Amino acid sequence: MEFYGTIGPACAQPETLQRMVEAGMTGIRMNLSHGPLSAHKDWLDIIHAVGIPQLLIDLQGPELRIGTLPQPLVLEPGQSLRLGQGGVPCPAALVHAARPGQNLLLDDGRLLVQVAGADGAALQCTVVRGGTLQSRKSLAAPGLAVASPTLTEADLQNLQLAGACGVTGVMLPFVRGAEDIRALRRALEQAGAGQIRIFAKIENLAGVQALPEFLPLVDEVVIARGDLGNAMPLWELPRCQKQLSAVCRSAGVPFMVVTQMLDSMCSRAVPTRAEVSDIYNAVSDGASRVMLTGETAAGQYPVEAMEYLVRTARTALE
């Protein structure tokens, strides 16, 4: 069983990471949607100094995100929001593809806006579910196919550095089919890093449907419930997770379950009963890896969260 945290300001100190390792953490994830590998030398130095054996980098891939904001935006229901030129930066491909009536989910679905109009340069939206929007948060358009490359230019640059930085695995978001995996494999080999393992993230319906097709090409599967939960009604997500788990288990391919495993521990020292039950069930369904994201990257209790993750998963294995 492997246990991963995500590095961020809340845990990027040698003492904190060491305590997380002592709690049972075996690997760390670095989210490159917030900055390139070359900008994180300080984090890499700490990771290697502590001796964390597994280092995963999470690429941007075909994922949609907003750009950098000068300051967080507080959005209220009914308020207008401009996405694109002259407003909140967002991918041009989305601006060109979205039509009035399209729902857009921000920050793993915490915020919801609806497209009211488009002028070719931006989308004029109305806030349906408000909240605070911060830089580089995820953006999803349920039911809309947005043309985007498997790997961005930034991804290719990060892959060139991956081997020298001690990366052991690459997480590819929003896998849509076998060609996405082949493209990543080619890029790794061209970078002289063909030994690095590929973790395919299932985050949309295309990935769910194509899983049997690309399963033989990957080293591990990641059931990433944040954006996957944006692609369907939330009440269908548990069934989808169990179905994906069964497919991976039958094929003998290791899989990981991630996103909001202990979300309440971003601000509370003790998890909810539902959260520990969720971890237990994921492991009982065959997950051989579980991961924390915001809980360790930005939460108030990164060490305690790792302790609960490890202890609950190990109890499920008894």
Language model: regions and residue ranges:
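Non-catalytic helical/linker scaffolds that mediate oligomerization, partner binding
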Residues: M1-E318
